[in-house]
Each structure stands twice: as structure tokens, then as C-alpha cells.
Swiss-Prot record:
Protein name according to UniProt: SLIT-ROBO Rho GTPase-activating protein 2
Every Rho-GAP domain range: 489-679
Swiss-Prot/TrEMBL site (Arginine finger) positions: 527
Region span, Disordered: 181-211, 703-726, 794-820, 835-936, 983-1012, 1029-1071
Residues with Phosphoserine modification: 206, 427, 500, 691, 695, 724, 795, 916, 930, 990, 994, 1013, 1027
GO cellular component, one term: dendritic spine head
Keyword terms of this UniProt record: Cell membrane, Cell projection, Coiled coil, Cytoplasm, Cytoplasmic vesicle, GTPase activation, Membrane, Methylation, Neurogenesis, Nucleus, Phosphoprotein, Postsynaptic cell membrane, SH3 domain, Synapse
Organism of provenance: Rattus norvegicus (Rat)
Subunit structure: Homodimer. Forms a heterooligomer with SRGAP1 and SRGAP3 through its F-BAR domain. Interacts (via SH3 domain) with GPHN. Interacts (via SH3 domain) with FMNL1 (activated by RAC1); regulates the actin filament severing activity of FMNL1 and actin dynamics. Interacts (via SH3 domain) with FMNL3. Interacts with RAC1; specifically stimulates RAC1 GTPase activity. Interacts (via F-BAR domain) with HOMER1. Interacts with ROBO1 and ROBO2. Interacts with FASLG. Interacts with PRMT5.
Gene for this chain: Srgap2
Amino acid sequence: MTSPAKFKKDKEIIAEYDTQVKEIRAQLTEQMKCLDQQCELRVQLLQDLQDFFRKKAEIEMDYSRNLEKLAERFLAKTRSTKDQQFKKDQNVLSPVNCWNLLLNQVKRESRDHTTLSDIYLNNIIPRFVQVSEDSGRLFKKSKEVGQQLQDDLMKVLNELYSVMKTYHMYNADSISAQSKLKEAEKQEEKQIGKSVKQEDRQTPRSPDSTANVRIEEKHVRRSSVKKIEKMKEKRQAKYTENKLKAIKARNEYLLALEATNASVFKYYIHDLSDIIDQCCDLGYHASLNRALRTFLSAELNLEQSKHEGLDAIENAVENLDATSDKQRLMEMYNNVFCPPMKFEFQPHMGDMASQLCAQQPVQSELVQRRQQLQSRLSTLKIENEEVKKTMEATLQTIQDIVTVEDFDVSDCFQYSNSMESVKSTVSETFMSKPSIAKRRANQQETEQFYFTKMKEYLEGRNLITKLQAKHDLLQKTLGESQRTDCSLARRSSTVRKQDSSQAIPLVVESCIRFISRHGLRHEGVFRVSGSQVEVNDIKNAFERGEDPLAGDQNDHDMDSIAGVLKLYFRGLEHPLFPKDIFHDLIACVTMDNLQERAVHIRKVLLVLPKPTLIIMRYLFAFLNHLSQFSEENMMDPYNLAICFGPSLMSVPEGHDQVSCQAHVNELIKTIIIQHENIFPNPRELEGPIYSRGGSMEDYCDSTHGETISAEDSTQDVTAEHHTSDDECEPIEAIAKFDYVGRTARELSFKKGASLLLYQRASDDWWEGRHNGIDGLIPHQYIVVQDTEDGVVERSSPKSEIEVMSEPPEEKVTARTGASCPSGGHVADIYLANINKQRKRPESGSIRKAFRSDSHGLGSSLTDSSSPGVGASCRPSSQPIMSQNLPKEGPDKCSISGHGSLNSISRHSSLKNRMDSPQIRKTATAGRSKSFNNHRPMDPEVIAQDIEATMNSALNELQELERQSSAKHTPDVVLDTLEPLKTSPVVAPTSEPSSPLHTQLLKDPEPAFQRSASTAGDIACAFRPVKSVKMAAPVKPPATRPKPTVFPKTNATSPGVNSSASPQSTDKSCTV
């Protein structure tokens, strides 16, 4: 049996239970204390919030009062000034407007902070008081509920204690009865054993005596056994009874124990959480959230109100405008700034002569004085113009200084954890930088220089004004027909144009023609002032009836040409826009809808004479064309209107010049943009029109061009017929590369796209269609197809007629070496083409020449494996044939001459002949013989053939030169024959390479350069080929073709001697 010492005694069990209960009771007490402490913290927090917002309300109120005092202090000064009377009409200067808005913002902030203080006191603080009262009341009720739950829990624990003691008592009685029962059983066993032993020890003496003894002993044993059995039975019954009671008590104890554990778990896990959440915190956080959101709403609305005021101030700062302020100032003090009445002649003592006397003997003196004034004025104007340019440059420097963007102080408001870093950031402001002193010194020095130049300019202008007035009066008095003033020169020019019945005056047509050819991309055209000396020279030439801008010369300053055009319109005696329609036109500007504005402007302008409308239509079409290049020339319609507004439409006297000029500029801008909708079309109003794509044809037909012979006239008529035929039959082309148009006129397409070509618009462009849209197509990005020989070119009309009138050329034969599969006798083909070029008669008139590109003679003579040949080189004014001629070799021949042949064959006259049906067949036949009949030849024989053919061609060319009575044309053979003997050896290759991939050596001598007349006339010199690479994969052109520019064909470059070769119009290729 197990020793009883190993089991806990009742006292130990009771002591442990009591200790556990005491711990629970102490924990419950601490829970109440913790909740009490939490309630006190909430009350204290709410009290602190009330005190905080009460103090903040006081601060906001004080801040509001201070802001109001600040605003009233300065508003009182503003009310006392005269500017206040204009405030109702909003007729205040922009800085004053900023100042007024700043004061209004201060007053607005004052009102907002007063409102904020009132919200703190009457809204937010009462909310916190209410939350505090509700929290305390709810906590008391929550504490009562918690105390009741704790009492119930302690009651359960006491019940468990009672059940446990009952279980211990019954279990002890059961154990005691069990021990007694076991003791009775032991006695019974002991008694039975004792009886057996006594019977064994006794020996019987006589039968009678033995029987008596046995009877007595049996009687004694029976009585003792019965007693033991009765005692055993009693103890057995007692044990059974006590055992049953112990089992029942244990069951009750286990049930009570489980219930107690469940109650404890429920209290700690559920009841406490419910008491805190649903009793103590009931509505506390929600009420606090509402109160704080009220604070946030007030602050955010305050911030929004402040931002609205700051936005108004920012808008006023953006509208700071010196011009508008000047206009308002003059309007406010109109009596002060209006010009005084003119001084009238006051006769003395009855002298009524109020005009200059130009009779003898003072006439000669007046003439001499006028000449002196004229000379003096020319000098002064030039000097004053230079001073003006210097002054404007200095003014721009000052504006750059004062407009530097150094106002961003966002770095000073970066978040920082320490106040020291904030202070260091704030200390490094703009005003504390060391460079501010130097900057201020530079600014003051620049300002001093500017005012010096301004004073000098104004003094010079005053002197010019006085001398000009005297000169004009003398000029008027003397009655001379010619004046040096630009305005009178333009009037005389206008009279001559009207007398000659010309719709567009010469000066207008010539200047626009020159600018449209050479100056569409000139930056600042019409804005930058030109040279006064050159302006006077051009003006004098027009006065004499000459056209100084005729031909293809480009040695004039573009700004000077633009200045001449502006001065012409400025000096018209009868301006294009008469003053009697000034108010009607200005009224149209007030319309917001651009289309309606154009309609009304059209109605006003239709009352003008037809000659004036024709000139307007021509001029504004040109200005619209010019504005389309604004990305390069920086002259959009608005900038052009600023430059042309004062010249075309002057503000009548009695009107404010500043305010009216802005409306004039807007009017001119509208006419430039909507010129097609404003002016009548050619059907409604007959007369010349400005043509963008083919304007040179109009120039060629001008009466100011050179005389056109009857032969040329016949050719022109026939050329027009052929051109129309070409336009009626579109040509199909395939795109070689992807192209993205840079303007609305240029078409975009993908590689392999099918294109329809109508006609050649220029050297680099076709007019065609793609996906139903008409526009310009770059020639270098397409492959033109034809049904006859796969290649077609649209040449100029003149060249086609010349080809028809010439007999077919002799077929060219060539011999090739076995080692040169793609090479022919280059010299034969070259000389044959030179003969064609020499036989072309020159014309004295200005013609429009279109260049054929890579599908001319050069491409027909080269291998089809290199499609880029002849498509990417520019002919020079001094070709060097010796660098491209083949040199004999023992086992190989050079084909570098193909590049030279291709370049020369691209001359407009030569390639146009090759495009005609007769010559095309001849070229095809010659090509088949020279390139397909490959017979092995000795290199020495080839060299001898070249020399013999060259000598023969030289004799023929010299004979033609002697017979020709036209102007000498530079002889290509004579110019290139001598370099032929000393030309460097060019490494041959098996096939020609595209000029796009050809590397060029540096010229030993600089090539003749043409003046920068136009992008289409730029030429580069032929250079020796350094190395000819193998045929590379076809790539897009190195540079995009430039927009359409129409070059001339009869001009020579300045500075080129008579031996230079004719300029080619080829510009499609870049090396």
C-alpha cells in the first residue's frame, strides 16, 4: 500500500486554495483601481484640451485684432489718396492693385481668425466638457457593474470551498470504515486458524470424556465466530454507506470546480472586456473624434480662405504690366499728358506771309541748306540706330538681372527635428548671400550705362526730329519730286507701279520673292533691324526703277530686305487700312469667336478698292506662309502682327496709342491666320496671288523679270501642256523607309507603303497622295516606278521641250575588262553627256528648274545592287574629274568614275533629256552595249581610248564655244583636263558604293562657295574618293530633305571666276 505521507493533508489543500483565492481577490481590487486611474487620466486630458483651446482662442483673438489694426493703419492712408477714387472703376495701377489685395487679405485673415476663436470658445470647448461629464458618469455605472461581477465570482469561489470540504469529510469517513472492515476480516481469519490448531493438539482418553469436551469447545467456538461475523457485517455496511457518500461528494466537488473555472474564465476574458468597451469607453472616442474634427474643419476652412486670397494676389502679381500701367496713368491724368496745341504763326506788324520763301536770291541758299540737312540726317540716323541697338542690348541685360528667379524659399520650410537646423536654414536666405553685394554693384553699373545710352539716344532722336522737320518743310517748299525719306520714296514707287498698271508694286513683289526664297527660316525676320546704309541703297535702287533683288544673288542682308518692305507700307501716302474704317475694324476684335471675327473683317474690307485688296491678299498670304516656319524663324502670327501692325495701320490722332495698338496687333494677327476666309478668292477678285509651292512661276512671269524671247515663250506654252499631262497621270511609288512628317503639309508613311505622285514640287519633294490625304512626299524616301524601264523622273517643263527639239544622241559604246563585271568605259559615256550639256542654249529669263534625283542618268548607268548611287552627292562649282577617272592597272580597273559621271549627269538639262522618250531609249541601248558586252581588254588600250576620246571631245567643245554667241559657260572638260594627269589613284572595288557611305578626303584647295542664298542652292565641292566601301544595306538618308525651296538656274555665285562650272540645283544629297 502507498504510504499516507505522500498525500497532501486537508490543511495543506485548504491553505493552497485560500492562497489562490486571496490572489484573485487582490487582482480584482487592482482592476478597480486601474479603471479609476484611467478615468482620472481621461478627465485630466479633457481638462487640458479645454484649457489649450481656451488659450488658443485668446491668441487667435489677439492676432485678429493686431491684423485688423495693421490693415486699418494702411487702409486709412489709402483712403486719403486720390487713387481711391478710381478704385470703383477698377482703374488702378497693377502694383496698387497688388497692394490693395494684400491689405484685403490681411483683413480677411483677421475676420477668419476671429471666427476661429469663436469656434474654439463656443463649439469645441463645450464638446470637451460634455465628453468629460459623460465619461465620468459612465465610469461610475461601469464600476458598479464590475463590482457586482466580482462579488458573484467570489460567491462561486466560496461555494467551491464548501463543496471541497464536504468531499474531504466523506472521503475521510469512507477511508476509516474501510480500515475497520479490514480489521474485522483479519480477526475472523485469526479466530478460525486458532480453532483448527486446538483440535489438532488434543488427544482423546475415553470416549465419554472426549465427547463432552468436544461439545463444550464447539459451543465456545460457535459463539465467538458469530460475534466476529456480526461485527464484520456491521462494518461492511458502514463501509458501503460511507463509500457511497464519498463518491457523491467527489462528484459534487468536480462539478463545482468546473463551474468555478468557467466563471473565472468568463470574467477575465469576456466580462472585463465588455465592461471597458461597452461601459467605460461608451461614446468616449466618438465624441472626442467629433470635437477634434470640428477643429480640423475650422483650420482647413481657414487655410482654404487664405489660399483663395493668396490666389487672388498671385493673379495680380502675374498681371503686373508696365504697358498697361502706363496706359492707365495717362488715362487718369489725361490733361497732364495730352499734347499741347500747336504753335501757330503770329504775324508781326501785318506780315501775313506764313510760308517759306523759295524765290531768288534765297532759293540757292535753301537748296544748299536742304542738302546739308539731308547729309546730316543720314549720318545722325545711322549713329542713332547704333546707339539704339546698344541701348536695347543693355536693357535686355538689365531685364535678365531683375527677372532672375530667386524667390523660392521652400528650403527654409523643410521639416527638421531640431530648431538649430531651422535657424541655420533661415539664415542662408537670398539677402544674406555674399554675392548680393556684387550683384547689386553690377546692376547699378549696368543701369548707369543704360541711362547714359538712353539719354544719348533721346537727344539724338530729338535732334533728328528737329532737323527732319526743317528738311521736310524745305523739301516741300522747294517742290522737288524725289525725297530721301523712305515714305516719299515709297509713294513715288507706288505712282510708278500704278502708272505701269501693275497690281503688285515692284518693291513688294521683289522683297517678298527674296524673303520667300531665302528667308523663311531666318530667325527674327521683320523683328531685327537691318543696316540703315543697305536699306538706303536698296531704297534708292527702287526709286530709280531698278530691282536690286533680281536674279539669284544672295548678298543682301535679310533684315535689311524686311526693313525695306516694312518702310514701304509705313510710308504710303494712302495706307492699306484707311482711317475711316479704323473703328469698324477695331470693333471686330472684341468678338471672341475667330470665325465670326473673320466674317465681320471681310465685310469691312470689301468696301476698299480692288487694287488695295489685291495687295492685301498677296501680303497676308505671304505672312501666313512665313508664320508656318515659326519654329525656326521665331515669328508666329502674333509676332508678325506686332512688327507689321504699326506699319500697316496707324492709330488716328486723339486715340490712346498704347491701348489701340494692342487691338491693331490682334486685328493683324487675325487677318494673317484667317486670310483665306477674309479676302476674295481669284474667282471673286482677279489678280495675282501669292503661291507657296510654285511662287517662282509668278515671279518668272513678272514684268520686272528679264525679257523673254519668242522661242522661250513657245517653250513655256508647250511646257505647260506637258506639265498638265503629267499631272493627269499619277505615278506610283513605293516607300523605301519610314517617314514621319514634320509639318501638316508633309505626309507620313511606313516602309513599303504605296504612294501616288502627281508632280515634282521641288528638288527634294513630290506632290502626291497617301491614304486619301494630299501633301508633300520626300524624294529620297521613295522608289519611283514606271512601266517602261522601272524608273521615271519628272523634269522641268523647259528641259522637256528642249529635248524634243534636239536630235537623238549617238549611242555610246564601251569596252570593259574581264576583271570588271560592273564597269564600262566611263569616259565615253561622260563625254557624250558633256556634249549634250554644251549643246543646251542658255536663256536670259528666270526659269523654274526641277532637279531629277537618283533615277536619272547616274542610276541608269550604275549597278542595280547599289540603289543609293547618285542619290547622295552634291555637285560643286568646281568639279575635279581627275579624281574620279579610272586608272589603268594590270589586273583590275576602277569604277570610281561612276560617281563622277553620276554627279554630272544630275545637271537639270542633262537628266531631263534622259527622261524624254527618245533619249531614254538611246540611253537604254547604250547601257546595254557598254555594260552587257563584257569583252576582255588590256588596261593600256583602255587608257589610250580614254585619251583619244577626250581629245576628240575637247576639239568639238572648243568649236562649239567659238560658234556660240551666248554668255560663256565654264568648260567642264577644259577645267578638269589638267588635273586628270596628276589625279590620285583610287582603290578599285568590285562594285560601286552608295555616296551615302563614301568617305571623302580633304580638298587640297578650298572649293568655291556660293553665298547662302537658299537651302536649295547650297553646293559642295567634288572631293576625291578616299575609299570605296562594299555595298552596304540600304539605310535612310543621312539627313531629311529640306522643305520645298525653288532655286534659280541662271545665277552665278559671287566671287567665282569665269572658268568655274555652272551651279547645279542638286541639293538632295548629303555626303
